[in-house]
Amino acid sequence: FNTDNSTMMAVFFDEATSADGSLEAVKEIRSIAGEQCFVSGMSSVVEDIKDLTMQEAPMYVVIAVILTSIILALTMDSFLIPLFFMLSVGMAIVYNMGTNFIQGEISFITEALAAVLQLAVTIDYSIFLWHSYKEEKEKHPGDNKEAMAVAIGKTITSVVSSSITTVAGFLALCFMSYELGMDMGIVMAKGVVIGVICCITVLPSMILVFD
């Protein structure tokens, strides 16, 4: 479509609006046309949102970690224990992100939100273990390992039942008509399971080493 000194071209993609092929085509069009061309439409909007989201994703995580650490430092009886909590949850997040290869590729929305959501959902497990450990230390003075062993047993009993309901809630997302639901559901359900495992393995080890 031509008018005066401007030309408008309509481009139709064979794939869906947010498909990888469509987004790659938008990138290619922009690289060929340069700054003299303005690309609009849903595919270009999705591509812009994807780029912006991936740029800001690390900032989301940093803000979440800082705010959570401040709250824990103010409410816990130790300023050091929040660091152990963050290290434990951080390892769980890394394991969760690393095991996403089984799905081939995950949505950029899931990738941007998964870390923050996993931190918010699983940090409670660490708090429960810590308080249980403190109670058992009073019952087993001078024997931290025995106190931690009992605390882990109590934590497993309470946390597993709680995590099952959380996992079930995330798996319910898999029944959404949008693929994002299944994507987010699987990643977050897996993240909760890994979070529980790290809570009863990694965190107790760190606490015993530094206590």
Mark where each language-model region is.
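Extracytoplasmic
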Residues: F1-F12, E47-D51
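Membrane-embedded transmembrane helical bundles of large multi-pass transporters/channels
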Residues: T17-D211
